[in-house]
């Protein structure tokens, strides 16, 4: 069994984890309520085995951001996701979305003008 590469970083001021070996393809993973970026590891095991990387972020009031002042409000989170996505575009020509619950909804709002290759939405709030 091989160990999946895992790198903690900050992207556009947002704590993130990048899973997998260097690739031209990536999934942006946005967790749901009470989730965190680390929960993406299970999905990353499958995606990385297929040649993808997974970039998972922490939403405000979650994970590494639990004790920070930012709030989980659409008008705050949507620009954050847009900023993360803008920094992803020069690095990965193929970007897909994996969103869970409220994270799926927030990502859909943030990226509605973008041409995502594919979106996997788990229990999206609609």
Q: Where are the language model's segments positioned?
A:
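N-terminal cap/lid segment of alpha/beta-hydrolase-fold proteins
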Residues: 1-21
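Gly/Ala-rich beta-loop-alpha elbow adjacent to hydrolase catalytic centers
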Residues: 99-107
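Short beta-strand immediately N-terminal to the catalytic nucleophile in serine-hydrolase-like folds
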Residues: 97-99, 122
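Active-site nucleophile loop of the alpha/beta-hydrolase fold
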Residues: 120-126
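Conserved alpha/beta-hydrolase
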Residues: 47-66
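The conserved beta1-alpha1 loop
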Residues: 28-32
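Catalytic nucleophile-loop/oxyanion-hole region of alpha/beta-hydrolase
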Residues: 63-91
């Amino acid at each position: 069994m091989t160990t999946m590469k895992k790198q903690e970083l900050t992207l556009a001021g947002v704590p993130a984890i990048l899973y997998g070996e260097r690739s031209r393809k990536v999934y942006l993973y946005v967790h749901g309520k009470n989730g965190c970026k680390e929960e993406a590891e299970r999905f990353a095991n499958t995606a990385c085995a297929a040649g993808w990387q997974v970039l998972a972020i922490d939403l405000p009031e979650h994970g590494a951001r639990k004790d920070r002042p930012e709030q989980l409000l659409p008008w705050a989170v949507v620009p954050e996701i847009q900023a993360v996505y803008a920094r992803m575009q020069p690095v990965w020509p193929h970007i897909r979305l994996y969103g869970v619950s409220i994270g799926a909804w927030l990502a859909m709002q943030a990226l509605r003008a973008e041409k995502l290759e594919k979106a996997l939405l788990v229990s999206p709030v609609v």
